[in-house]
């Protein structure tokens, strides 16, 4: 009796072990890791022209293929954005004379849907276009050149944020966004695919550039509340105007990431499980 129980336990343990190994193999074969290198730029108060001031950007990503048409995706993106009134067309912008630059650190998670079924290394599913929809958190830190040094703008409250001069507090340097992207994938080998993507990040803030669309704060009161540097960087207009609108609050800022890179299937050579299809 004891021998039978021992044999039964050994069978159960062996079965569970093989089941776990198969599950791990399936999860690995459905997973991909990769990278993309490309560019980033922003559209907002200090730049309305696409691809102007494009900076080098990069992305690390993980993809878990739910089936041949649907995948879950995680990605970390680094980019840089900037804008200068001095390079915009129009007397208003030239006179306003504001500028900024900011590093971006973005973490995003979402769903990717392919136009055609796709699997790396499968001759039947060699290439496809896809759509990506995500939610993201992005750390921003707009800075401006002042007296030969880069000065962080958010702590200064250049529109009177955080004082009695404004009805709002200082904006957060971590912002929520909605990345939407179009891309294409092409299988190059049993375990490697080419990835091309262009995406827009719709943001829930108008302060990527530290310009929120409100009127200029009184410079004397702003200097008393937030310091002389805040007042100096709040209004850099050539004619000293402080009665007009500082920016356009009817629209919010957004930025893009586009790139090309490679995806590598984890788990080695071979087709995905039959239920993947």
Where are each of the predicted segments found?
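Outer-membrane beta-barrel transmembrane domain signature
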Residues: 136-253
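Residues on the lipid-exposed face of transmembrane beta-strands in outer-membrane beta-barrel proteins
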Residues: 35-39, 60-64, 109-113, 133-135, ...
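Residues that define the transmembrane beta-barrel architecture of outer-membrane proteins
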Residues: 29, 52-56, 103-107, 127, ...
């Amino acid at each position: 009796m004891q021998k039978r129980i021992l044999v039964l336990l050994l069978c159960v343990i062996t079965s569970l072990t093989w089941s776990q190994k198969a599950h791990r193999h399936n999860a690995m074969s459905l997973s991909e890791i990769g990278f993309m290198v490309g560019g980033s730029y922003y559209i907002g108060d200090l730049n309305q022209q696409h691809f102007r001031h494009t900076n080098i950007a990069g992305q690390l990503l993980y993809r878990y293929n739910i089936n041949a048409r649907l995948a879950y995706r995680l990605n970390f993106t680094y980019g840089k954005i900037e804008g200068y009134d001095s390079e915009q067309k129009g007397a208003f912008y030239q006179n306003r004379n504001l500028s900024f630059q900011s590093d971006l650190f973005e973490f995003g998670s979402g769903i990717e849907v392919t136009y055609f079924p796709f699997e790396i290394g499968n001759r039947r599913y060699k290439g496809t276009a896809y759509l990506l929809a995500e939610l993201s958190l992005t750390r921003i830190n707009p800075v401006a050149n002042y007296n030969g040094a880069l000065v962080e703008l958010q702590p200064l409250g250049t529109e009177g944020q955080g004082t009695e001069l404004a009805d709002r507090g200082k904006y957060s340097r971590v912002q929520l966004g909605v990345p939407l992207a179009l891309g294409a994938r092409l299988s190059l080998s049993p375990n490697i695919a080419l990835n091309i993507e262009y995406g827009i990040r719709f943001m829930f803030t108008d302060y990527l550039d530290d310009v929120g669309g409100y009127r200029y704060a009184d410079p004397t009161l702003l200097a008393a509340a937030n310091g002389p540097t805040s007042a100096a960087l709040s209004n850099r207009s050539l004619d000293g105007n402080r009665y007009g609108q500082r920016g356009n609050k009817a629209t919010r800022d957004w930025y893009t990431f586009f790139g090309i890179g490679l995806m590598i299937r984890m788990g080695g050579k071979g087709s995905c499980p039959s239920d993947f299809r």
